[in-house]
From Swiss-Prot:
Record keywords: Cytoplasm, Hydrolase, RNA-binding, tRNA-binding
Subcellular location(s) of the protein: Cytoplasm
Reactions catalysed: glycyl-tRNA(Ala) + H2O = tRNA(Ala) + glycine + H(+); a D-aminoacyl-tRNA + H2O = a tRNA + a D-alpha-amino acid + H(+)
EC number per UniProt: 3.1.1.96
Top enzyme class: hydrolase
GO CC annotation terms, alphabetical: cytoplasm
Chain span(s) of sequence motif Gly-cisPro motif, important for rejection of L-amino acids: 137-138
HAMAP family: Deacylase_Dtd
Description of how the protein assembles with itself and partners: Homodimer.
SUPFAM superfamilies: DTD-like (SSF69500)
Protein name: D-aminoacyl-tRNA deacylase
Originating species: Shouchella clausii (strain KSM-K16)
Highest rank taxon of the organism: Bacteria
GO annotation, biological process: D-amino acid catabolic process
């Protein structure tokens, strides 16, 4: 599993010109599910993301998590995180999980984040989306379960 974590001042996602998710300060997550991912991978990444200390404390050191800050999360499914570009010029997405499995694990990931105490907004799985964010920093971290 791969989660591209972006610290954001705000973020939103639209489907068919309708806003389906909107957050203030927090994290924008692009979430990719691998074909061999399991519930353990999902739980690991949710725990890591929720407790990742990438927000500044009162001493201006990256020492606080999104939970510490009371921030929220915008979670977007993103199978293209498993695009392999080693051969040719068109990415190969064979390592990405099939949609049925990916949707189930993506929903479990978001549920785990909520269980940890986060407010989670999402895009629409499998839809063409317009994602907007204002990066904060910028701070961008790749969390992987493998």
């Amino acid at each position: 599993m791969r989660v591209l974590v972006q610290r954001a001042k705000r973020g939103s996602v639209r489907v068919d010109q309708k806003t389906v998710g909107d957050i203030g300060p927090g994290l924008v997550l692009l979430v990719g599910i691998h074909q061999e991912d399991t519930e353990a991978d999902v739980r690991f990444c949710a725990e890591k993301v929720a407790h990742l200390r990438i927000f500044e404390d009162s001493s201006a050191k990256m020492n606080e998590s999104v939970l510490d800050q009371g921030g929220s999360v915008l979670s977007i499914s993103q199978f293209t995180l498993y695009g392999d570009c080693k051969k040719g010029r068109r990415p190969n997405f064979m390592r990405a999980a099939k949609p049925e499995k990916a949707k189930l694990l993506y929903e479990r990931f978001n549920s785990y984040l909520r269980e940890l105490g986060l407010v989670v907004e999402t895009g629409e799985f499998g839809a063409m989306m317009e994602v907007e964010l204002i990066n904060d920093g910028p701070v961008t971290i790749l969390v992987e379960s493998e």
